[in-house]
Design a protein with these regions (language model features):
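Active-site cores that bind ATP or allylic diphosphates and position pyrophosphate for catalysis
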Residues: 1-189
């Protein structure tokens, strides 16, 4: 029912504002919600378009094991990395005495005006090549459409990273936020 959909949207996004991209998508998906066992039939275009970047959680776990990493920091980005991101990764690695960092970029749908995944991929790889110690960073991506659910989505992102073998997640300013729906540091609390 509309009442149930609205209740779920309010709980997930903290708003029913139809201008919120997550609310808009969620409330326009229809009135049926399906649950049960999941079987992946297709990895969509991600594997074909990003053969050097897209990897499943199992593939990432395997590479982490092959590298011998025990303590692994994850950094998610939907933007090209810049100097502050580099410093965040370095600080987290140093503070935790981590073996490496997984830079995990979003390859799915983002909001209007965001930089295309292929450009982000090139930028991230160049930054890693030029500014990080060799073999300290794994660059990967995953096919997930941003929900823009703020703090709740940050928890979901942490579960994703835990499933792929990471022990820590860097949660930045306005993580999974959009507009003024969430405070800039709500996901860090």
């Amino acid at each position: 029912s509309d009442e149930q959909i609205n209740l779920m949207a309010q709980e997930i996004f903290g708003t029913l504002d139809p201008e919120h991209p997550g609310v808009s998508t969620f409330t326009n998906l229809g009135r049926n919600i399906v649950s049960g066992d999941i079987q992946v039939l297709s990895l969509s275009y991600f594997q074909a378009d990003f053969p050097d970047t897209f990897r499943t959680a199992a593939e990432i776990r395997d590479e982490i094991t092959q590298r011998g990493w025990k303590k692994v920091v994850a950094f998610q980005t939907r933007n090209p990395m810049h100097r502050a991101h580099e410093e965040l990764c370095r600080m987290a690695m140093a503070r935790l005495d981590a073996d490496g960092v997984v830079v995990h970029m979003l390859l799915g749908k983002l909001k209007k005006g965001d930089i295309p995944a292929s450009v982000r991929d090139d930028c991230i790889r160049k930054m890693v090549e030029l500014y990080f110690p060799e073999n300290s960073v794994m660059v990967t991506g995953y096919g997930f459409d941003m929900l823009y659910a703020g703090p709740r989505e940050a928890v979901l992102h942490a579960v994703f990273r835990q499933n792929m073998g990471c022990t820590h997640l860097i949660v930045g300013r306005d993580h999974a936020g959009v507009g003024d729906y969430y405070g800039a540091f709500d996901a860090q609390i």
